[in-house]
Regions:
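Conserved RecA-like ASCE P-loop NTPase motor core of nucleic-acid helicases/translocases
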Residues: 151-158
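Interdomain "pre-motor" coupling segment immediately N-terminal to P-loop NTPase/helicase cores
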Residues: 34-92
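Conserved helix/coil segment N-terminal to the catalytic DExD/H
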Residues: 183-214, 225-230
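Conserved pre-motif I regulatory segment
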Residues: 84-130
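Post-DEXD/H (motif II) to motif III coupling segment of the RecA-like Helicase ATP-binding lobe
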Residues: 221-278
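Walker A/P-loop
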Residues: 123-148
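Feature captures the catalytic cores and cofactor-binding loops of soluble hydro-lyases/lyases
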Residues: 276-328
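Conserved helix-turn-beta segment of the N-terminal RecA-like "Helicase ATP-binding" lobe
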Residues: 160-184
Length: 328
């Protein structure tokens, strides 16, 4: 039986010790074609083949977050995998999570799935949390930041979400104001919590990112792949890495890249389960300007302009529609 050995390089990459044959297999296994690549100038001009290779057969490096996929690769081929002890889970139980949250003066009771997600994230140290609209993911983010109590960078896609996240933290009991970075705002701070748009920091030097022990990406599916990769690969010393997204459909970054940069997907809950539990903030049709985490969550966003003359043109305010959650 062939043995592959995983060794930690830093918080971004690991190496896989393999021979020529298995290295070729790994390279093929972790190679995918970028959707729409045939329309890209680099491909049309034959500067690039339109494929992304997550395993570098020369350096034998791959994103650390893809370790479970490497394990699956080995299981499918009856290869033995030896894993660096540095990737062992932390000891953190659900009861410990509950005891910690009881010490917080929160304005409402934590839902069971929020506690489960919090415990899972601390135990694994990295995860891509699939958390739909109205599931209260900003509270999970707050719990992570409060428990870890380390220099934390929270990255969001829009200015409105920077302000909303900071406001949510205040409402949960955070003392002081998180440092909010948008275009033109000072990026240096002693504040333990920094909330920024990815557009404001993706060109910052690697040295600037060395200060952070925790990185959390909210609405991760909306980040442009090149910018997200630029940010996350500069955080080579950041051990706690969490991505939050409401969907993995239509992401601007390939799912395997998201998992590689953050960690394995963990389903927090589903919209169907939220409604069955009687969550009052029921989904609605939005006008395309909602953040997706507001008090009036939308299961479908459609701008008035795009709806004019289209399939939604016959809908008017107050109309009732039926959504089949089995197909959502």
């Amino acid at each position: 039986m062939e043995t592959l050995t995983v060794k930690k390089v830093n918080e971004v990459y690991m190496t896989i010790d393999c021979d020529g044959g298995s290295c070729f297999e790994l390279s093929d296994y972790f190679t995918f074609t970028v959707p729409g690549m045939q329309f890209m100038p680099a491909v049309r001009n034959k500067f690039w083949d339109g494929k992304i290779r997550l395993f570098n057969a020369q350096t034998k490096k791959i994103y650390s977050g893809l370790l479970p996929h490497v394990q699956k690769f080995c299981d499918e081929r009856d290869y033995k995998l030896e894993i660096d002890p540095a990737y062992a889970d932390e000891e953190f139980s659900l009861s410990e999570a509950g005891r910690f949250t009881n010490t917080l003066d929160l304005p409402f009771e934590i839902r069971d799935y929020q506690l489960d997600a919090f415990a899972h994230a601390i135990k694994k140290k990295r995860a891509l949390m699939l958390s739909p609209t109205a599931s209260g993911k900003s509270l999970i983010i707050y719990l992570l930041a409060a428990y870890l109590n380390k220099k934390t960078l929270i990255v969001v896609p829009t200015i409105s979400l920077v302000q909303q996240m900071a406001g949510d933290f205040k409402s949960y009991g955070y003392q002081g104001d998180p440092h909010m970075i948008t275009a033109g705002v000072e990026k240096e701070t002693d504040n333990p919590i920094t909330v920024s748009t990815w557009q404001s920091i993706h060109k910052m030097p690697k040295k600037w990112f060395e200060q952070f022990d925790v990185v959390i990406g909210d609405e991760a599916h909306l980040f442009k792949s090149k910018s997200l990769t630029s940010i996350m690969t500069k955080l080579i010393g950041t051990p706690y890495r969490y991505g939050f997204t409401g969907t993995l459909d239509g992401t601007l970054t390939h799912r395997l890249v998201l998992e590689g940069l953050f960690g394995s997907v963990e389903k927090v809950t589903t919209t169907d389960e939220l409604i069955k539990k009687g969550i009052t903030e029921l989904p609605c049709i939005g006008d395309g300007r909602q953040s997706g985490t507001s008090g009036s969550p939308s299961i479908l966003n459609a701008s008035p302009e795009s709806a004019t003359g289209g399939g939604l043109a016959w809908l008017k305010t107050g109309d009732t529609i039926v959504i089949d959650l089995n197909n959502y």
